[in-house]
Amino acid sequence: MRAIRMLLVSALTLGSLSATLSAHAGEQDVQRLTQLLEKSQTIEANFSQLTLDAGGTSLQETTGKMTVKRPGLFYWHTDAPQEQVVVSDGKNVTLWDPDLEQATIKKLDVRLNQTPALLLSGDVSKISQSFDITSKEQGEVMDFTLKPTTKDTLFDSLRVSFRRGLINDMQLIDSVGQRTNILFNGVKANQAVPDSTFKFDIPKGADVIKE
């Protein structure tokens, strides 16, 4: 959740041919991923999240619900005992921590390599500018691995998997090898979702921090 919150391009002739084929394959991967992402204008799902350290030791397990809507709207609710709500209205992101009775508001960073949640709700038409993308298909599952093209990102790699055309799971790996696995279930796409879903009313008396 934290990763989402803050939590995915003779010998000369042969060489030229290889580069051309590689570029063509990359373009196909980008096109496939873009089509799958843009296919779902809204997504509602439950999720379970597991965070592991580089050695495979479990650091945190959480569950929750999410709703996303293009362009740039998302709502993530992590269940107790580590309850949190993260909401984007397309302009700002509000993080609500009920235990602290504190809301943190910051401007939405629309860069895909800084806000992975926007893969599911943002503008992905220029996704190839942010990531090098490869894909692998196994039966009804399509896996995409996204590696940021710059170093100033929250993660080193992001894997996004689709089953029968719907989002199935995501995995983020950061610079120290920590892995965050998110499995979605009960996925519903292209349902009517009112924009009011993404308006968070801060409780009276709560601390408000604006960044």
From Swiss-Prot:
Belongs to the LolA family. This is Outer-membrane lipoprotein carrier protein. Transmembrane segments: none annotated. It comes from the Bacteria. Monomer. Disulfide bonds: none annotated. It comes from Pseudomonas putida (strain W619). Residues 1-25 form the signal peptide. It is found in: Periplasm. Keywords: Chaperone, Periplasm, Protein transport, Signal, Transport. The keyword Amino-acid biosynthesis does not apply. The keyword Iron does not apply. Participates in the translocation of lipoproteins from the inner membrane to the outer membrane. Only forms a complex with a lipoprotein if the residue after the N-terminal Cys is not an aspartate (The Asp acts as a targeting signal to indicate that the lipoprotein should stay in the inner membrane). One of its GO terms (cellular component) is outer membrane-bounded periplasmic space. PANTHER family: OUTER-MEMBRANE LIPOPROTEIN CARRIER PROTEIN. GO terms for biological process: lipoprotein localization to outer membrane; lipoprotein transport.
